[in-house]
Amino acid sequence: MATSVAKYFLLSRCSGIIRSVTLQGKLPPVCIRNSQCPSFSYGNRASDNPQDGHVNIPVDRLTVSYSRSSGPGGQHVNKVSTKAEVRFHVYTADWIPEDVRQKIILNNKNRINKAGELLVTSEQSRSQQRNMGDCIQKISDIIAKATEKPHEPSAEDIALRASRLEKRNKERLKQKKLHSAVKQTRRVCFD
């Protein structure tokens, strides 16, 4: 039942307004205008074309479960299952490119269980739908982080690093000679 609720209704809070979004198998791409509005698509941030590396997160491939949230709240927190737990099998997630999948596995070893499922939980809100949206946002952030390419240093950066290394080495040798000279002056000659 939790999966069907997640599949058809998602309440997301954008600029204080709660709206219902009907989902048809895949989550629609939503742009972030503020930090409260989740994005369900990801792409290569360095590219100019937003369709490059664009992958939607299919809701039907996610396993969603709800449980009791921890923390203060009295009777409400003890009665209502609002903590959302979203998981999916990383090794068979064909909607994620292979190199990104390997990077996710490498970077999130503590979130992957023995069955090979990436587990993401959220209990920030008192609403199941908001916690579900937060979990999907976390998955999107994990995938976006794994999608980012490492920064390639320019020739100027390499030259700057080499000059700093050379300067540091000269300073180290200078300090070494000073220390040696101080020790030389402390020696007593018994001749």
Swiss-Prot record:
SUPFAM superfamilies: Peptidyl-tRNA hydrolase domain-like
Cellular localization per UniProt: Mitochondrion
Keywords for this protein: Hydrolase, Mitochondrion, Protein biosynthesis, Ribonucleoprotein, Ribosomal protein, Transit peptide
A cellular component annotation (GO) from this entry: mitochondrion
One Gene Ontology biological process: mitochondrial translational termination
A Pfam family it matches: RF-1
Major localisation: mitochondrion
Entry superkingdom: Eukaryota
Residue range covered by the transit peptide: 1-34
EC number: 3.1.1.29
Record field: catalytic activity: an N-acyl-L-alpha-aminoacyl-tRNA + H2O = an N-acyl-L-amino acid + a tRNA + H(+)
An example Gene Ontology molecular-function term: peptidyl-tRNA hydrolase activity
InterPro entries in the cross-refs: Mito_Release_Factor_mL62, Pep_chain_release_fac_I
Subunit structure: Component of the mitochondrial 39S ribosomal subunit.
Family: Belongs to the prokaryotic/mitochondrial release factor family. Mitochondrion-specific ribosomal protein mL62 subfamily.
Job of this protein: Essential peptidyl-tRNA hydrolase component of the mitochondrial large ribosomal subunit. Acts as a codon-independent translation release factor that has lost all stop codon specificity and directs the termination of translation in mitochondrion, possibly in case of abortive elongation. May be involved in the hydrolysis of peptidyl-tRNAs that have been prematurely terminated and thus in the recycling of stalled mitochondrial ribosomes.
Name assigned to this protein: Large ribosomal subunit protein mL62
